[in-house]
Protein backbone atom coordinates (compact mmCIF):
# COMPACT_ATOMS: atom_id res chain seq x y z
CA UNK A 1 0.00 0.00 0.00
CA UNK A 2 1.05 3.59 -0.57
CA UNK A 3 0.72 6.06 2.27
CA UNK A 4 1.25 9.80 2.19
CA UNK A 5 2.24 11.78 5.25
CA UNK A 6 2.33 15.58 5.52
CA UNK A 7 5.79 15.51 7.12
CA UNK A 8 7.51 12.34 5.86
CA UNK A 9 6.03 12.19 2.35
CA UNK A 10 5.17 9.12 0.24
CA UNK A 11 6.04 5.62 1.41
CA UNK A 12 5.35 2.10 0.21
CA UNK A 13 4.26 -0.15 3.07
CA UNK A 14 3.66 -3.90 2.83
CA UNK A 15 3.73 -7.12 4.83
CA UNK A 16 3.00 -7.05 8.53
CA UNK A 17 2.90 -3.24 8.72
CA UNK A 18 0.29 -3.04 5.96
CA UNK A 19 -1.92 -5.62 7.68
CA UNK A 20 -1.59 -3.86 11.02
CA UNK A 21 -2.47 -0.48 9.48
CA UNK A 22 -5.63 -2.04 8.01
CA UNK A 23 -6.59 -3.68 11.33
CA UNK A 24 -9.59 -2.41 13.30
CA UNK A 25 -7.60 -1.11 16.31
CA UNK A 26 -5.37 1.07 14.11
CA UNK A 27 -8.23 2.20 11.83
CA UNK A 28 -10.19 3.21 14.94
CA UNK A 29 -7.51 5.82 15.64
CA UNK A 30 -8.79 7.81 12.65
CA UNK A 31 -11.72 8.66 14.92
CA UNK A 32 -9.65 9.65 17.96
CA UNK A 33 -8.46 13.25 18.00
CA UNK A 34 -4.97 13.78 19.38
CA UNK A 35 -5.98 16.88 21.32
CA UNK A 36 -8.81 15.30 23.29
CA UNK A 37 -11.51 17.97 23.50
CA UNK A 38 -9.57 20.42 21.34
CA UNK A 39 -11.54 19.84 18.14
CA UNK A 40 -14.80 20.68 19.92
CA UNK A 41 -13.59 24.22 20.72
CA UNK A 42 -11.48 24.81 17.60
CA UNK A 43 -12.28 22.81 14.45
CA UNK A 44 -8.72 23.33 13.16
CA UNK A 45 -7.28 21.38 16.09
CA UNK A 46 -8.03 18.08 14.39
CA UNK A 47 -4.87 15.95 14.21
CA UNK A 48 -5.81 12.31 14.84
CA UNK A 49 -4.06 9.53 16.72
CA UNK A 50 -3.93 7.64 13.40
CA UNK A 51 -1.87 10.37 11.71
CA UNK A 52 0.48 10.46 14.69
CA UNK A 53 0.84 6.65 14.83
CA UNK A 54 1.72 6.48 11.13
CA UNK A 55 4.13 9.37 11.68
CA UNK A 56 5.92 7.66 14.56
CA UNK A 57 6.30 4.50 12.48
CA UNK A 58 7.75 6.50 9.56
CA UNK A 59 10.09 8.51 11.78
CA UNK A 60 11.48 5.30 13.29
CA UNK A 61 11.93 3.98 9.73
CA UNK A 62 13.71 7.21 8.69
CA UNK A 63 16.09 6.87 11.63
CA UNK A 64 16.99 3.29 10.67
CA UNK A 65 14.84 1.50 13.23
CA UNK A 66 13.97 -2.18 12.80
CA UNK A 67 10.64 -3.47 11.51
CA UNK A 68 9.94 -4.60 15.08
CA UNK A 69 10.39 -1.08 16.42
CA UNK A 70 8.28 0.32 13.57
CA UNK A 71 5.51 -2.12 14.62
CA UNK A 72 5.80 -0.93 18.23
CA UNK A 73 5.65 2.68 17.02
CA UNK A 74 2.58 2.06 14.87
CA UNK A 75 0.74 0.36 17.74
CA UNK A 76 1.86 2.47 20.70
CA UNK A 77 -1.41 4.47 20.86
CA UNK A 78 -4.02 1.82 19.97
CA UNK A 79 -5.35 1.77 23.54
CA UNK A 80 -6.07 5.50 23.64
CA UNK A 81 -9.67 6.01 24.65
CA UNK A 82 -12.12 8.35 23.00
CA UNK A 83 -11.01 11.94 23.66
CA UNK A 84 -7.46 10.83 24.47
CA UNK A 85 -6.14 12.44 27.67
CA UNK A 86 -9.51 13.93 28.67
CA UNK A 87 -10.16 10.51 30.19
CA UNK A 88 -7.17 11.03 32.49
CA UNK A 89 -8.99 14.10 33.85
CA UNK A 90 -12.17 12.03 34.22
CA UNK A 91 -10.40 9.35 36.24
CA UNK A 92 -8.16 11.90 38.00
CA UNK A 93 -5.07 10.16 36.64
CA UNK A 94 -2.28 12.70 37.12
CA UNK A 95 0.30 10.55 35.32
CA UNK A 96 -1.90 10.75 32.18
CA UNK A 97 -1.21 7.08 31.45
CA UNK A 98 -4.67 5.47 31.53
CA UNK A 99 -4.16 4.28 27.95
CA UNK A 100 -0.86 2.63 28.91
CA UNK A 101 -2.52 0.81 31.81
CA UNK A 102 -5.06 -0.84 29.48
CA UNK A 103 -2.68 -1.38 26.53
CA UNK A 104 -2.16 -5.14 27.00
CA UNK A 105 -5.88 -5.74 27.51
CA UNK A 106 -6.77 -3.89 24.29
CA UNK A 107 -4.07 -5.68 22.27
CA UNK A 108 -4.95 -9.18 23.51
CA UNK A 109 -8.65 -8.79 22.68
CA UNK A 110 -8.00 -7.70 19.08
CA UNK A 111 -6.80 -9.28 15.84
CA UNK A 112 -3.29 -7.87 16.37
CA UNK A 113 -1.80 -11.03 17.98
CA UNK A 114 -3.01 -13.16 15.04
CA UNK A 115 -1.53 -10.73 12.50
CA UNK A 116 1.80 -10.69 14.32
CA UNK A 117 1.88 -14.49 14.68
CA UNK A 118 1.09 -14.93 10.98
CA UNK A 119 4.23 -12.95 10.16
CA UNK A 120 6.41 -14.73 12.71
CA UNK A 121 6.34 -12.20 15.53
CA UNK A 122 5.41 -12.77 19.18
CA UNK A 123 3.05 -10.23 20.72
CA UNK A 124 4.50 -10.58 24.21
CA UNK A 125 8.04 -10.13 22.95
CA UNK A 126 7.21 -7.08 20.82
CA UNK A 127 4.70 -5.19 22.90
CA UNK A 128 5.12 -6.03 26.58
CA UNK A 129 7.96 -3.60 27.31
CA UNK A 130 8.32 -0.20 25.62
CA UNK A 131 11.74 0.35 27.15
CA UNK A 132 13.15 -2.07 24.55
CA UNK A 133 12.32 0.44 21.83
CA UNK A 134 14.76 3.24 22.50
CA UNK A 135 13.90 5.29 19.41
CA UNK A 136 10.18 5.09 20.15
CA UNK A 137 10.22 6.09 23.82
CA UNK A 138 12.61 7.76 26.23
CA UNK A 139 11.90 9.18 29.66
CA UNK A 140 11.60 12.96 29.64
CA UNK A 141 13.49 15.20 29.16
CA UNK A 142 15.13 13.32 26.25
CA UNK A 143 14.01 13.15 22.63
CA UNK A 144 12.12 10.17 21.24
CA UNK A 145 10.05 9.45 18.13
CA UNK A 146 6.73 9.75 19.98
CA UNK A 147 7.53 13.15 21.53
CA UNK A 148 9.16 14.46 18.34
CA UNK A 149 6.33 13.49 16.00
CA UNK A 150 3.42 14.86 18.00
CA UNK A 151 5.27 18.14 18.52
CA UNK A 152 6.25 18.67 14.88
CA UNK A 153 2.88 17.43 13.60
CA UNK A 154 0.73 19.62 15.81
CA UNK A 155 2.88 22.71 15.44
CA UNK A 156 3.05 22.36 11.65
CA UNK A 157 -0.65 21.64 11.25
CA UNK A 158 -1.62 24.52 13.52
CA UNK A 159 0.63 27.05 11.77
CA UNK A 160 3.41 27.58 14.32
CA UNK A 161 6.21 26.15 12.16
CA UNK A 162 6.52 25.48 8.43
CA UNK A 163 7.28 22.21 6.67
CA UNK A 164 10.82 23.26 5.76
CA UNK A 165 11.61 23.94 9.42
CA UNK A 166 10.21 20.57 10.51
CA UNK A 167 12.12 18.65 7.85
CA UNK A 168 15.33 20.59 8.50
CA UNK A 169 15.17 19.60 12.16
CA UNK A 170 14.63 15.94 11.20
CA UNK A 171 17.77 16.14 9.06
CA UNK A 172 19.65 17.29 12.17
CA UNK A 173 18.84 14.16 14.17
CA UNK A 174 21.52 11.55 14.78
CA UNK A 175 21.21 8.05 16.25
CA UNK A 176 23.68 6.71 18.81
CA UNK A 177 23.23 3.41 20.67
CA UNK A 178 19.67 3.15 19.42
CA UNK A 179 18.67 6.61 20.67
CA UNK A 180 18.02 9.87 18.84
CA UNK A 181 19.71 13.19 19.56
CA UNK A 182 19.98 16.64 17.94
CA UNK A 183 23.33 17.03 16.20
CA UNK A 184 23.94 20.58 17.48
CA UNK A 185 22.93 22.99 20.22
CA UNK A 186 21.17 25.10 17.57
CA UNK A 187 18.94 22.16 16.60
CA UNK A 188 18.27 21.43 20.28
CA UNK A 189 17.33 25.07 20.97
CA UNK A 190 14.94 25.12 18.03
CA UNK A 191 13.15 21.95 19.11
CA UNK A 192 12.95 23.00 22.76
CA UNK A 193 11.27 26.27 21.74
CA UNK A 194 8.78 24.41 19.52
CA UNK A 195 8.09 21.79 22.19
CA UNK A 196 7.12 24.49 24.68
CA UNK A 197 4.83 26.07 22.09
CA UNK A 198 3.13 22.66 22.08
CA UNK A 199 2.95 21.81 25.78
CA UNK A 200 2.51 25.33 27.17
CA UNK A 201 0.98 27.54 24.47
CA UNK A 202 -1.25 24.78 22.99
CA UNK A 203 -1.92 22.26 25.77
CA UNK A 204 -2.41 25.05 28.33
CA UNK A 205 -4.22 27.41 25.95
CA UNK A 206 -7.23 28.66 27.99
CA UNK A 207 -9.70 27.57 25.28
CA UNK A 208 -8.13 24.10 25.19
CA UNK A 209 -8.15 23.80 28.99
CA UNK A 210 -11.82 24.85 29.05
CA UNK A 211 -12.71 22.13 26.52
CA UNK A 212 -10.90 19.50 28.60
CA UNK A 213 -12.59 20.59 31.82
CA UNK A 214 -16.14 20.64 30.49
CA UNK A 215 -15.86 17.47 28.42
CA UNK A 216 -14.40 15.71 31.47
CA UNK A 217 -17.38 16.93 33.51
CA UNK A 218 -19.77 15.64 30.84
CA UNK A 219 -18.07 12.23 30.75
CA UNK A 220 -18.03 12.00 34.56
CA UNK A 221 -21.76 12.75 34.62
CA UNK A 222 -22.39 10.21 31.85
CA UNK A 223 -20.51 7.51 33.77
CA UNK A 224 -22.28 8.42 37.02
CA UNK A 225 -25.72 8.21 35.36
CA UNK A 226 -24.82 4.98 33.49
CA UNK A 227 -25.21 6.74 30.15
CA UNK A 228 -21.87 5.20 29.16
CA UNK A 229 -19.55 2.57 30.62
CA UNK A 230 -15.76 2.53 30.75
CA UNK A 231 -15.89 0.01 27.86
CA UNK A 232 -17.71 2.58 25.70
CA UNK A 233 -14.63 4.78 25.92
CA UNK A 234 -12.90 2.32 23.58
CA UNK A 235 -15.20 3.51 20.79
CA UNK A 236 -14.38 6.58 18.65
CA UNK A 237 -14.91 10.18 19.74
CA UNK A 238 -17.96 10.55 17.51
CA UNK A 239 -19.53 7.29 18.66
CA UNK A 240 -19.29 8.37 22.29
CA UNK A 241 -20.61 11.84 21.46
CA UNK A 242 -23.58 10.23 19.71
CA UNK A 243 -24.38 8.17 22.83
CA UNK A 244 -24.15 11.27 25.03
CA UNK A 245 -26.33 13.36 22.74
CA UNK A 246 -28.96 10.63 22.46
CA UNK A 247 -29.10 10.12 26.23
CA UNK A 248 -31.66 12.82 27.11
CA UNK A 249 -29.79 13.22 30.40
CA UNK A 250 -30.15 16.89 31.31
CA UNK A 251 -26.83 17.23 33.15
CA UNK A 252 -24.85 15.60 30.34
CA UNK A 253 -26.61 17.57 27.60
CA UNK A 254 -26.21 20.87 29.45
CA UNK A 255 -22.47 20.31 29.80
CA UNK A 256 -22.13 19.24 26.16
CA UNK A 257 -23.91 22.32 24.84
CA UNK A 258 -21.40 24.51 26.69
CA UNK A 259 -18.51 23.10 24.62
CA UNK A 260 -18.29 24.85 21.25
CA UNK A 261 -15.98 27.14 19.22
CA UNK A 262 -17.84 30.27 20.35
CA UNK A 263 -16.80 30.09 24.00
CA UNK A 264 -14.73 32.96 25.39
CA UNK A 265 -12.33 32.45 28.29
CA UNK A 266 -9.30 34.17 29.76
CA UNK A 267 -6.65 33.40 32.35
CA UNK A 268 -7.36 35.15 35.64
CA UNK A 269 -5.47 34.14 38.78
CA UNK A 270 -7.84 36.07 41.07
CA UNK A 271 -11.41 35.82 39.75
CA UNK A 272 -11.42 32.37 38.19
CA UNK A 273 -14.10 29.75 37.63
CA UNK A 274 -11.83 26.71 37.75
CA UNK A 275 -8.19 25.69 37.94
CA UNK A 276 -6.51 22.87 36.03
CA UNK A 277 -3.02 21.39 36.11
CA UNK A 278 -1.62 18.98 33.57
CA UNK A 279 1.23 16.50 33.57
CA UNK A 280 4.62 18.21 33.83
CA UNK A 281 6.22 17.99 30.38
CA UNK A 282 9.81 19.23 30.13
CA UNK A 283 12.41 18.75 27.40
CA UNK A 284 16.20 19.04 27.66
CA UNK A 285 17.78 16.80 25.02
CA UNK A 286 21.36 15.64 25.38
CA UNK A 287 23.92 16.65 22.75
CA UNK A 288 27.45 15.38 22.08
CA UNK A 289 29.99 18.08 22.88
CA UNK A 290 33.72 17.86 23.63
CA UNK A 291 33.63 14.06 23.49
CA UNK A 292 30.82 13.70 26.03
CA UNK A 293 27.05 13.80 26.29
CA UNK A 294 25.67 16.86 28.04
CA UNK A 295 22.19 18.26 28.60
CA UNK A 296 21.35 21.17 26.29
CA UNK A 297 20.59 23.36 29.30
CA UNK A 298 24.20 22.91 30.44
CA UNK A 299 25.38 24.61 27.26
CA UNK A 300 22.52 26.94 26.34
CA UNK A 301 21.17 29.63 28.64
CA UNK A 302 18.22 29.88 26.25
CA UNK A 303 17.25 26.24 26.86
CA UNK A 304 17.72 26.65 30.61
CA UNK A 305 15.46 29.72 30.74
CA UNK A 306 12.78 28.14 28.55
CA UNK A 307 12.78 25.07 30.79
CA UNK A 308 12.47 27.13 33.96
CA UNK A 309 9.60 29.20 32.53
CA UNK A 310 7.80 26.04 31.38
CA UNK A 311 8.31 24.40 34.77
CA UNK A 312 6.84 27.38 36.62
CA UNK A 313 3.87 27.60 34.25
CA UNK A 314 3.10 23.87 34.49
CA UNK A 315 3.54 23.89 38.28
CA UNK A 316 1.12 26.81 38.62
CA UNK A 317 -1.46 25.39 36.22
CA UNK A 318 -4.12 27.49 34.53
CA UNK A 319 -6.80 29.59 36.24
CA UNK A 320 -9.72 30.04 33.85
CA UNK A 321 -12.38 32.73 33.94
CA UNK A 322 -15.37 32.14 31.66
CA UNK A 323 -16.56 35.23 29.78
CA UNK A 324 -19.07 33.59 27.45
CA UNK A 325 -20.37 30.04 27.19
UniProtKB/Swiss-Prot annotation:
GO molecular function: dGTPase activity
Occurrences of domain HD (ranges): 49-151
Superkingdom: Bacteria
GO biological process, one term: dGTP catabolic process
Pfam family, one: HD
InterPro entries given in the database record: dGTPase-like, HD/PDEase_dom, HD_domain
Protein known as: Uncharacterized protein YdhJ
Species, as recorded: Bacillus subtilis (strain 168)
Amino acid sequence: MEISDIIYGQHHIDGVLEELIKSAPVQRLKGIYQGGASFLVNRKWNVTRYEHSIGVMLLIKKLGGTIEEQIAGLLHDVSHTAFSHVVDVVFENQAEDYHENIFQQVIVHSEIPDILQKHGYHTEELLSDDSRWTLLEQPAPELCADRTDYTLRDMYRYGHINLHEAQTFLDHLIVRNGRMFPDSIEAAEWFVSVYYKEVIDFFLNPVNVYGYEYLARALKAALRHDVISAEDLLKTDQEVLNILRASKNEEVLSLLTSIHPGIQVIEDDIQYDFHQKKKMRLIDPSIFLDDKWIKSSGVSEKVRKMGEAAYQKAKKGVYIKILKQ
